[in-house]
Design a protein with these regions (language model features):
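Acidic catalytic/metal-coordinating carboxylates
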Residues: 35-36, 61-68, 86
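Two-component/phosphorelay signaling modules centered on CheY-like receiver
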Residues: 2-5, 13-32, 72
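Active-site residues of response regulator receiver
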Residues: 55, 83
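Short amphipathic alpha-helix used as the core "switch/output" element in two-component signaling
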Residues: 42, 64-75, 93, 97
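Receiver (REC) domain active-site loop signature in two-component systems and cognate sites
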Residues: 58
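C-terminal output helix
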Residues: 87-89, 103, 107-117
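Active-site beta3 strand of CheY-like receiver
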Residues: 8, 47-53
Length: 141
């Protein structure tokens, strides 16, 4: 049985968040939107594959800070950044911290969907590798 991937959209701009959620739902993905990093952090950690679409600049906890917190907490869910205020150093920082992509607003739908597909594929591979490693540990312990 295959678990359907979940995409989390975290953006303080309601119109952008709603637009991205609608696009992803239309593409057949399971989606959950959040108006802030704080709201997202209140959610339980996902069990299955997926990714997080993050706005870089948000009030309170920024997207970059949220990415760091997720990594520190052991979340391996891949991140796709979206921003209207990106620059090269910011995108380099995000990519070094493990982001799959860094898209500037306005972005085209195909670019976002392709980035999400890559992120989900990466997460599925990581989850599969972890499961195989755990099976080996059980077998040889």
């Amino acid at each position: 049985m295959t678990v359907e991937p979940m995409v989390f959209v975290v953006d303080d701009d309601r119109s952008v968040r709603r637009s991205v959620v609608r696009l992803l739902e239309t593409a057949g993905l399971l989606v959950e939107g959040f108006p802030s990093a704080e709201a997202f952090l209140e959610r339980e950690r996902p069990d299955g594959p997926g990714c997080v679409v993050l706005d870089v600049r948000m009030p309170g906890i920024s997207g970059l800070e949220l990415q760091r917190r997720l990594t520190a907490a052991g979340w391996s869910t891949p991140v796709v950044f979206i921003t209207g205020h990106g620059d090269v150093p910011m995108s380099v920082e995000a990519m070094k911290d493990g982001a799959v992509d860094f898209l500037l607003k306005p972005f085209d739908d195909e670019s976002l969907l392709a980035a999400i597909d890559r992120a989900i594929a990466r997460d599925r591979a990581l989850l599969r590798d972890r499961l195989q490693l755990e099976e080996l540990r059980v077998r040889y312990d």
